């Protein structure tokens, strides 16, 4: 009886506490017709998101109503836990835009298609993008200056000219702009072909970011349902503070979901590093190792940093990366994002360009993303350990679909569709490639002398440093076609394991695989087809491939351990991995799974939906 009463008392306390939390949580409203002197109720909304952010407390929700909000949201605090977070959301069914730009009028015609406008420097406040040079570690300027400013005509991003004389010429393929900052004013020249800019929508970058806290440790924030664009973001190398159009700034537990994010001078979404006095002064492997040690003393651990969720976003038109994160992305999930048109202007270059560029993807899951026209789709640079890259669709990426650079693993790459001219670029060890469709080239780096970290199990704690010989990779049950070629592994320095792979239409096996299934005359006739309900992959397969070889379901046990860290291939929570579903989530045949990412094909031509169209 006493035990029953005690249990009832505990349950009552829990219920009372939960109801108290619910009762204390508030919803604040923001609307274009509101006022920042209002109380934020539905009847008396604030006018700016920033005003609501100042009063919101853990557990509160900020609902923003339709309109364009030209402001930088700097959340002054975060939530207390995953259950008591601060949520910023667009009102259901309403289009809410947050922009780092301002509308500019009063353009004066100079000649032909060239116009100019002169603005007082106070228009920009403390930050002027037209005086802000893009620079930093591993940045390649191509012999000219680049600024974080931008000019948009009816939403179209003009290209920055290197010199004013270029803007004064007739408009070529790409319309140009040029800026000059004097002590009191900023003048912008721009080409507006066949239009009067005073009769069009012309916007210019003014703010460095759109949603970014000015200090680290603003945890447990949700940002949902917005269109966010136009940010004068800086170059974001792994050795500096990484500011994105939206960014988490060295915090924990953010959810960034169902947003449209575009038009960033450098980075769209940052899950990145804090800033310090060593920013952009560490352009070497040894210096980055020192950066890592400083991060460990600055709270880089499982309890403090990472655990973010970035899902169902559309990210485009960023000239460095769609998503970036140096050490701050650990233990995160990046899923179901459409990332495209990254690094398209190609006016500058550097070692940080990708759809997704992560340093230290420790226990990070990158799954079901659609990445194309991004230069490089995914780049796991240093410290990919416990990383899973699963069921991603990558094509039309000019550099490669996946680059693993100086990682020691374990990294599991399964059920992906890699269709770009180069599928894999491997300068690492400890990778497991399982049930992928690989149509492009595979580059294997024989040896890299850089000493890079490996970590204790499911931890940021550094266990040691090691150089990077090629090998210690596993390839099981993959479907190679066209340029897919495993022969670079014939001379790998470390052992490799291969089995159950199929090679079509000129794809080449490695001598390391004892019994590959070779079908040199089989044409998969592969191409993508857009339909109203999504994107489909059309290809030819043959059911006989199942019967011609016996394959087994790939598991933690069958993969063994990555050699250098001595760790198994398992999930972030430490449970065993079993590759028993395919790209679409269909159960694998437990007795003899089919090669490649699709488990139940039909012989001959078939259409497989690889991306489902859905409203945000």
Language model features by range: what are they?
Residues 27-250, 255, 260-262, 270, ...:
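Extracellular polysaccharide-degrading/modifying enzymes targeting complex plant/algal/animal polysaccharides
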Residues 1-7:
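N-terminal secretory signal peptides that target proteins for export/translocation
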Residues 23-25:
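Boundary at the C-terminal end of the N-terminal hydrophobic targeting segment
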Residues 74, 81, 209-211, 233-249, ...:
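Glycine- and acidic/polar-rich repeat regions and solenoidal domains
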């Amino acid at each position: 009886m006493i035990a029953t009463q005690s249990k009832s008392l505990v349950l009552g306390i829990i219920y009372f506490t939960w109801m108290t939390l619910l009762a204390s949580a508030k919803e604040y409203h923001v609307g274009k017709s509101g006022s920042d002197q209002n109380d934020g109720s539905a009847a008396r909304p604030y006018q700016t998101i920033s005003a609501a952010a100042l009063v919101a407390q853990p557990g509160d929700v900020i609902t923003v109503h339709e309109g364009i909000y030209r402001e930088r949201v700097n959340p002054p605090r975060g939530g207390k836990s995953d259950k008591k977070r601060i949520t910023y959301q667009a009102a259901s069914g309403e289009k809410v835009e947050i922009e780092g730009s301002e509308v500019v009028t009063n353009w004066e015609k100079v000649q032909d298609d060239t116009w100019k406008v002169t603005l007082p420097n106070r228009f920009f406040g403390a930050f002027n993008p037209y005086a802000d040079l893009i620079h930093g570690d591993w940045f390649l300027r191509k012999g000219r200056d680049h600024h974080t400013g931008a000019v948009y005509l009816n939403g179209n991003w003009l290209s920055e000219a290197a010199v004013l004389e270029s803007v004064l010429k007739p408009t070529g393929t790409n319309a140009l702009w040029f800026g000059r900052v004097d002590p009191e004013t900023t003048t912008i020249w721009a080409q507006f072909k066949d239009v009067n800019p005073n009769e069009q929508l012309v916007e210019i970058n003014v703010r460095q970011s759109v949603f970014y806290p000015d200090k680290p440790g603003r945890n447990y924030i949700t940002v949902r349902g917005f269109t966010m664009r136009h940010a004068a973001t800086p170059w974001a190398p792994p050795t500096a503070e990484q500011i994105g159009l939206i960014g988490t700034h060295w915090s924990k537990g953010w959810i960034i979901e169902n947003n449209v994010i575009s038009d960033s001078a450098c980075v769209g979404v940052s899950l990145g590093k804090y800033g310090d006095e060593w920013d952009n002064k560490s352009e070497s492997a040894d210096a980055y190792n020192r950066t890592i040690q400083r991060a460990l003393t600055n709270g880089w651990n499982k309890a403090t940093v990472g655990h973010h969720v970035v899902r169902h976003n559309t990210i485009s038109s960023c000239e460095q990366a769609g998503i970036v994160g140096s050490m701050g992305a650990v233990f995160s999930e990046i899923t179901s994002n459409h990332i495209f048109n990254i690094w398209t202007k190609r006016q500058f270059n550097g070692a940080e360009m990708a759809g997704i560029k992560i340093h230290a993807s420790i226990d990070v899951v990158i799954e079901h993303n659609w990445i194309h026209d991004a230069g490089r789709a995914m780049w796991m640079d240093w410290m990919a350990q416990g990383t899973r890259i699963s069921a991603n669709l990558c094509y039309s990426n000019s550099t490669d679909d996946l680059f693993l650079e100086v990682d020691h693993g374990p990294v599991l790459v399964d059920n992906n569709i890699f269709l770009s001219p180069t599928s894999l670029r491997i300068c690492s060890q400890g990778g497991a490639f399982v049930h992928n469709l690989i149509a492009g080239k595979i580059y294997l780096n024989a040896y890299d002398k850089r000493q890079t970290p490996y970590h204790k199990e499911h931890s940021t704690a550094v266990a040691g440093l090691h150089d990077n010989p090629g090998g210690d990779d596993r390839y099981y049950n993959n479907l190679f076609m066209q340029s897919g070629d495993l022969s670079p592994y014939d001379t790998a320095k470390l052992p490799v394991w291969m089995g159950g792979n199929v090679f079509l239409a000129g794809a080449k096996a490695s001598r390391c695989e004892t019994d590959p299934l070779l079908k040199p005359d089989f044409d998969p006739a592969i191409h993508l087809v857009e339909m109203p309900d999504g994107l489909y992959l059309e290809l030819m397969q043959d059911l006989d491939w199942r019967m011609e070889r016996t394959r087994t379901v790939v598991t933690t046990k069958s993969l063994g351990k990555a050699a250098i860290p001595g760790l198994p291939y398992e999930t972030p929570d430490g449970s065993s991995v079993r590759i028993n579903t395919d790209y679409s989530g269909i159960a694998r045949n437990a007795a003899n799974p089919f090669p490649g990412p699709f488990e139940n094909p039909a012989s001959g031509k078939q259409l497989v939906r690889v991306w489902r169209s859905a409203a945000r």
